[in-house]
Amino acid sequence: LNWSVKAIAEATKTKKMAGVNWQWNPVSKLWYFLKTDKDRFSTLCQGTGAYICDMWIEATIQICMERYGKPPALCGQFHDEMVLRSKDTPKARQIMEGIVQEAIERVNALVQMNTTLGCDVAFGKTYADIH
């Protein structure tokens, strides 16, 4: 595993601008601040994960806007999770799960990675119930 981490890190595109190092992320198409060269792999992984999560949340919002003319009740976002509020009925749960799953499908179409991204949906009254 260590050889692959090093190989992936070395394959990333970097540049120095105004004395600051930057790393290109081919998934997000963004340049990320690179504190040290040893951070290349983690910058790539964390930047990609944050971008995918942000796009997933954005797709969820877009779907709700398209269907209902308003965004979902987004209560929180933590690392790779989003917390939404909805009615506590079987129909509302089914609809919300469908929206969240469709949103990750849209992200898959956008990023076109060599693996299919997925997500789990959990329902509950507290964060402990859904985490």
PLM feature spans:
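Conserved catalytic core of nucleotide polymerization and phosphodiester-bond processing enzymes
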Residues: 1-131
